[in-house]
């Protein structure tokens, strides 16, 4: 089998690894600008919560007229705020179903370009909401930016995974998550009262998401389309060859094109799949279950509960400056994503995911103990900060970055878009459930709420240990072929997953 455009043959017979070209860097950077916006809009709603609620109150009172109540009912305000947070996920849930259709119709690059229409509209609506005295406009803007993020969550990993060299696919795939966490951190810093988190400037804070959208619109036209899409899906050999030359920096891409031809021949029996075809396929049942459970492990870990409500969590823990503690969590978030970038090709996807889940489970238990003892032991406020920081750090080691790009690795070209849609919908559905329901569950369970996440994390750890294979260093064709040789998840005996069991020996061994 040709070693692929990830490794291009040399005269001495030893296939050198593809170098990192300027075009590859530009393409990855331009793509992950979408992920930056995704993260920004996760974090931007947190710090200015109080001033936005004051705006909601003023808007509501203005509609009541003279002789009305003095303030908005607390239940109404809680519902409006929860809706403002969770509607973002509703937009993502709906648009994630369109990932496969749009990516096949427009191509990966043009789909990302067209998606920016939603970002510009959503940002503009959120920026104008206060001037229009309408929380409905803000909620609509959050819905549109959520729809943008839903498409981004599938399009970016798909594009980056298809243009990345095999030996860098994990590291470059992790940059998607790095951009998300940088976006969260930027939003948290700009949301401080000393920055844009004020009663007059918060609309600008929400509208700033337009800037990376405009930058992406400028840069993406200079980037190549995915050569896998061009050749395997569109059968355009000339444009695919040109794209390969730009990405690899090699004048002769015959070996690279040979791999695509070989993959295309094998996929002639595996045409692009619809959602219904994928869901009914026995061949793809096992990787689909793994993909969905990995997405659930990310969202039901409790991480978005921490990000959405981190300020209020730190307040309940007795932290004097909760907004700054939240930013500290954002810094930890970013630093440990960088750690994951460095480790993912050395330690492997499965190992990092297991480590992250185990660490998060321990931190969730520690957080529960700290919150329970807070009234009797004031120093527990510092323990709670350490627990949250540890929770975030372990998330970014594994459950944060791994699920997004491993879906693209588990599937061949035919079912990949539909699989990304299923995985994306699963992720966004859980995001919505956590965003809408966490505050109510936290009110009911108090400090014990993170024990619920600890139990879920333990379950995901067991599943990953038993069923998730290692994909490091494998081509897409090798991974999909291994699943075709392996019995369905429902038919296997329960035993630990190993790289050798699923993927066979390393071709270099």
From Swiss-Prot:
Native organism: Mus musculus
Modifications the protein undergoes after translation, according to the UniProt entry: Sumoylated.
Gene Ontology terms, MF aspect: D-glucose transmembrane transporter activity; D-glucose uniporter activity; insulin-responsive D-glucose:proton symporter activity
Modified residues (Phosphothreonine): 486
Disease: Defects in Slc2a4 may be the cause of certain post-receptor defects in non-insulin-dependent diabetes mellitus (NIDDM).
Protein name (Swiss-Prot/TrEMBL): Solute carrier family 2, facilitated glucose transporter member 4
Chief localisation class: membrane
Motif (Dileucine internalization motif): 489-490
The organism's taxonomic lineage, starting at the top: Eukaryota, Metazoa, Chordata, Craniata, Vertebrata
Side Extracellular, residues: 45-80, 132-141, 192-200, 308-322, 374-384, 438-444
A GO cellular component annotation in the UniProt record: sarcolemma
Known tissue expression: Expressed in skeletal and cardiac muscles. Expressed in brown and white adipose tissues.
């Amino acid at each position: 089998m040709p070693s692929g455009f990830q490794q291009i043959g040399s005269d001495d017979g030893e296939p050198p690894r593809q170098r990192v070209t300027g075009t590859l860097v530009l393409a990855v950077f331009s793509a992950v600008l979408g992920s930056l916006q995704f993260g920004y809009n996760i974090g931007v709603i947190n710090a200015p919560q109080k001033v936005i609620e004051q705006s909601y109150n003023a808007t509501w009172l203005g509609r009541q007229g003279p002789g009305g109540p003095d303030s908005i009912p607390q239940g109404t305000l809680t519902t409006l705020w929860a809706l403002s947070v969770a509607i973002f996920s509703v937009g993502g849930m709906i648009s994630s179903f369109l990932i496969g259709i749009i990516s096949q119709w427009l191509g990966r690059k043009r789909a990302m370009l067209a998606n920016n229409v939603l970002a510009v509209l959503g940002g503009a609506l959120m920026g104008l909401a206060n001037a229009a005295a309408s929380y409905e406009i803000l909620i609509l803007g959050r819905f549109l930016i959520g729809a943008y993020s839903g498409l981004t969550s599938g399009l970016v990993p798909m594009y980056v995974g298809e243009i990345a060299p095999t030996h860098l696919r994990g590291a470059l795939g992790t940059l998607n998550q790095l951009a998300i966490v940088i976006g969260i951190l930027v939003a948290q810093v700009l949301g401080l009262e000393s920055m844009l988190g004020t009663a007059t400037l918060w609309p600008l804070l929400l509208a700033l998401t337009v800037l990376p959208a405009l930058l992406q619109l400028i840069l993406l036209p200079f980037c190549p389309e995915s050569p896998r899409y061009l050749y395997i899906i569109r059968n355009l050999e000339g444009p695919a060859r040109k794209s390969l030359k730009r990405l690899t920096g090699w004048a002769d891409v015959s070996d690279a094109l040979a791999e695509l031809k070989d993959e295309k021949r094998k996929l002639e029996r595996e045409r692009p799949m619809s959602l219904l075809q994928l869901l009914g396929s026995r061949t793809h049942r096992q990787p689909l279950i793994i993909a969905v459970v990995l997405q659930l492990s990310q969202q039901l870990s409790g991480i978005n509960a921490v990000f959405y409500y981190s300020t209020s969590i730190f307040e309940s823990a007795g932290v004097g400056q909760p907004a700054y503690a939240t930013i500290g969590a954002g810094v930890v978030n970013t630093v440990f994503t960088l750690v994951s970038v460095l480790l993912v090709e050395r330690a492997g996807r499965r190992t990092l995911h297991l480590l992250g889940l185990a660490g998060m489970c321990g931190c969730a238990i520690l957080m529960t103990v700290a919150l329970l003892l807070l009234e009797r032991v004031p120093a527990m406020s510092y323990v709670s900060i350490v627990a949250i920081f540890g929770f975030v750090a372990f998330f970014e080691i594994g459950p944060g970055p791994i699920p997004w790009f491993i879906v693209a690795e588990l599937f061949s070209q035919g079912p990949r878009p539909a699989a990304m849609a299923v995985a994306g919908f699963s992720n966004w559905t859980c995001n919505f459930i956590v965003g809408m329901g966490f505050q109510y569950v936290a009110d009911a369970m108090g400090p014990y709420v993170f024990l619920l996440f600890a139990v879920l994390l333990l379950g995901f750890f067991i599943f990953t240990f038993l069923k998730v294979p290692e994909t490091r260093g494998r081509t897409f064709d090798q991974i999909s072929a291994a699943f075709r040789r392996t019995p369905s998840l429902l038919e296997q005996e329960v035993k630990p997953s190993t790289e050798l069991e699923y993927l066979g020996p390393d071709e270099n061994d």
